C-alpha cells in the first residue's frame, strides 16, 4: 500500500458542509469503515479553518484508487492526490 495526501479545495460559495444533501454523503466517504471496503486505509482528515481546504491522509494500492474513492469531492472544487511519505521514511532515506 502506498501513502497519499489528498487535498480538496472549494470556494465559500460551494462549501459542501453547508449543503444538507451533500454534507452527510461526504462524511460517509471519510468513514474509515467505508474506505476499508474500498481497499483504503484513512489515517486522518482535517479542514484548515476558514480556508475551505480539506486534507486527507490515506493509504491505497495506487493514486487512481484514492482519486476514484474521493472523487465526489471534485464535484464542488478541486481534488489533488499527492504521493507521500511518513516523516520516519523521509528521515530514514535522508531526503524528502
Where are these regions (language model features)?
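Short amphipathic alpha-helices in soluble, non-transmembrane regions
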Residues: 65-74
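Conserved RNP beta-strands of RNA recognition motif
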Residues: 56-57
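Short S/T/G/P-rich N-terminal loop/turn motif that feeds into the first structured element of a domain
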Residues: 1-36, 41-52, 61-63, 87-96
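Short acidic-hydrophobic, aromatic-tinged amphipathic segments that line or gate anion-handling sites
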Residues: 82-86
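A common structural junction motif
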Residues: 73-81
Amino acid at each position: 500500500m502506498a501513502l497519499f495526501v489528498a487535498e480538496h479545495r472549494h470556494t465559500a460559495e460551494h462549501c459542501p458542509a453547508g449543503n444538507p444533501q451533500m454534507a452527510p454523503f461526504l462524511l460517509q466517504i471519510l468513514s474509515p469503515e467505508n474506505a476499508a471496503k474500498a481497499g483504503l486505509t484513512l489515517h486522518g482528515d482535517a479542514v484548515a479553518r476558514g480556508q475551505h481546504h480539506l486534507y486527507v491522509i490515506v493509504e491505497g494500492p495506487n493514486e487512481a484508487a484514492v482519486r476514484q474513492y474521493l472523487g465526489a469531492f471534485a464535484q464542488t472544487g478541486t481534488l489533488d492526490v499527492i504521493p507521500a511519505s511518513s516523516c520516519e521514511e523521509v528521515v530514514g532515506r535522508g531526503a524528502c
